[in-house]
Design a protein with these regions (language model features):
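Active-site-facing alpha/beta catalytic cores
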Residues: 76, 81-325, 368, 393-395, ...
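Long, contiguous, compositionally biased segments that the model treats as domain-scale units
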Residues: 1-140
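Glycine-rich, charged/polar anion/phosphate-binding loops
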Residues: 53-55, 275-278, 305, 334-336
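Short acidic (Asp/Glu) and glycine-rich catalytic loops that position anionic groups and cofactors
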Residues: 67-73, 283-285, 314-316, 355-360
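Anionic group-transfer/hydrolysis microenvironments
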Residues: 72, 112, 294, 354, ...
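Non-transmembrane, aqueous-exposed alpha-helical and coiled segments at domain scale
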Residues: 302-305, 311, 317-349, 355-410
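Short coil-to-beta-strand
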Residues: 64-65, 349-351
């Protein structure tokens, strides 16, 4: 399809006539339309120029000259949008990025799964407890978590609350990443504390090398003013069309549509039907976009998604986020890499080592084994090395807090420990320590690359 036709603003609503999945059953659609009209009048959360910069950065990652780090909550909550929680999450990502930058010897693109990750796809529309059946919790943007009829009824006012919470989160992120909080020397000093913990001795070498590198830069007169600020982008799953569509704006410079709710949006595994509403809408916006690919994805599906979403083969436009499961990635990923490589397309390949590795403990906790997460990351790198393509990034669910949601890691969280601090309303996240440990392990893989 010719790009001008594809980016014609009048076609931005073509999705409305197509099959759509995973939307709330709004009790009163007239109110949704009123809220949408109000959202359409709100200022954009991000700017087209920033979105274009991100696309340029992602193009570098797709060609092996940068690495994407994407992380944040499984599902953000309105109550969780506090300064402390946001700061800790940003801090964790910055700490991971320093380690990855050193291990990769190349720039790391920092992106929060933040400031918009309020909607969740569900495997079932309804949830039953005892003899009561209510709508499933679809994230704070749609309904409440409490299991009552009032809480679980989708409320369009939540779309506005999601916008305002995203705006205040983004304001803090911008302040933290531009105001000196992100100073490289400061971030590295936090990491030294991690590496000095006896449980993490194997990472001491890397931390010491980074230390020497920073001292060398200081001695050589490097411009540390430049290193006090970092570029930090936002991304979320673009799921709720009644939120994403009103925040889609026409760029005054080019006359083309941008989704201004985030720099980067992705399509989930459950909503990537080639003839569905989400794929159509995503094909018409200028943002860099992602698609989640599970272990059953066929090479033909991957190629069809490229044709539909990136017909111009534009560098940085399309990211494939693979979520295979540790036991499946070594079989499922290479055929996709081969087929896409042979087609000449060059999407960015990113691993999501979280979503294919869920388990439920006998006590009923949803959890993931840290060893499985690590194994999937290793399988991702192995597949790329075998095929001769670039392992371009990692997508993780994490928090900056000391929660106990995933099993293992140097703190050796076991099933009995999960109950001490399990806070996620959705999927289990890596805690602060596990996230840093993952960064050191990925850095070791990057050094081999």
């Amino acid at each position: 399809m010719h790009s001008t036709a594809r980016l014609d603003p009048s076609a931005l609503d073509a999705w409305r006539s197509l099959p759509i999945k995973q939307q709330p059953e709004w009790p009163d659609y007239a109110e949704v339309e009123r809220v949408s009209a109000e959202l359409a009048q709100q200022p954009p959360l991000v700017f087209a120029g920033e979105v274009d910069s991100l696309k340029d950065r992602l193009a570098q990652a797709a060609s092996g000259r940068a690495f994407l780090l994407q992380g944040g909550d499984c599902a953000e909550t309105f109550a969780g949008a506090t300064a402390d929680k946001i700061r800790n999450r940003v801090k964790t990502l910055l700490q991971m990025a320093v380690v990855l930058t050193y291990g990769a010897s190349m720039p790391v693109i920092k992106m929060g799964r933040m400031a918009g990750q309020f909607a969740k796809p569900r495997s079932s529309d309804m949830e039953t407890r005892g003899d009561v059946t209510l709508p499933a919790y679809r994230g704070d943007i749609a309904n409440g978590y409490d299991f009552t009829a009032v809480s679980r009824t989708p409320d369009p006012q939540r779309l506005l609350k999601a916008y305002h919470t995203s705006a205040s989160t983004l304001n803090l992120i911008r302040a933290f990443t531009q105001g000196g909080f992100a100073d490289l020397r400061e971030v590295h000093s936090w990491n030294k504390g991690f590496a000095e913990n006896p449980a993490n001795q194997r990472y001491e070498r890397l931390a010491a090398e980074i230390d020497r590198a920073i001292k060398f830069m200081e001695a050589a007169g490097a411009d540390f003013d430049e290193l006090k600020r970092v570029e930090f982008y936002t991304g979320h799953e673009g799921l709720l069309m009644d939120y994403e569509r009103p925040l889609t704006r026409i760029d005054s410079r080019t006359g083309t549509p941008y989704n201004t709710s985030a720099h980067f949006v992705w399509i989930g595994e459950r909503t990537r039907d080639l003839d569905g509403a989400h794929v159509d809408y995503f094909s018409r916006i200028r943002n860099p976009i992602g698609v989640k690919l599970g272990p059953t994805t066929s090479p033909d599906t991957a190629l069809a998604l490229i044709d539909k979403l990136d017909p111009e083969r534009e560098p940085g436009r399309l990211t494939f986020i693979t979520r295979m499961g540790a036991g499946k990635i070594r079989d499922a990923l290479p055929p996709l890499l081969e087929a896409v490589k042979d087609s000449g397309a060059k999407p960015l390949w990113v691993t999501d080592p979280m979503h294919g590795n869920g388990i439920t403990t006998p006590t009923g906790y949803k959890t993931r084994r840290f060893d499985d997460v690590i194994d999937e990351v290793r399988g991702f790198f192995e597949a790329h090395r075998a095929v001769g393509t670039f392992p371009g990034g990692i997508h993780v669910e994490l928090t900056g807090d000391d929660v106990t949601e995933c099993l293992g890691g140097s703190e050796q969280i076991d099933e009995a420990t999960l109950a001490t601090r399990y806070e996620s309303l959705c999927d289990p996240r890596l805690n602060h320590m596990q996230s840093l440990e993952l960064a050191f392990l990925v850095a070791e893989e990057l050094e081999k690359r």
